[in-house]
Amino acid sequence: MTKWTLSVVLCGLLVASVSLQAHHSLAGVYALGKEAKVTGAFKAFRLVNPHSTMKIDVKNKDGSLVEWTFVGGSVQQISRLGLKEGPNALKPGDEITVTIVPALDGKSPVGLLSAITYADGHTVRFRSPDE
């Protein structure tokens, strides 16, 4: 009975550790509590769960383009906000300003998507500013 109980406990711990390993912490990648704005031309969404990504081209001071990638919400959230089809749909080339939580290193062209502001001034929020 003791061997069986020990086996069950060890299996449970193994399963739990795999689950915990699979989930990630935002604090290890993004500078939580900080905010940045990036303006550029929309390129595309990659709609996959659990986190979609959005890419924009940003022009540097020297005129060269840098592709930025932002992690956003789920496919359902993107659809619900009408970003793929609907009132807030983005088309390649649309000029937008993206509010993000920047990368922890402060240099990488990546961020956690907080909001998109369109050329006409309206904003779509993914998360509240204090999250």
Describe the role of every protein-language-model region.
Residues 73-81:
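Short, structured beta-strand/loop micro-motifs enriched in basic residues and often containing a Trp
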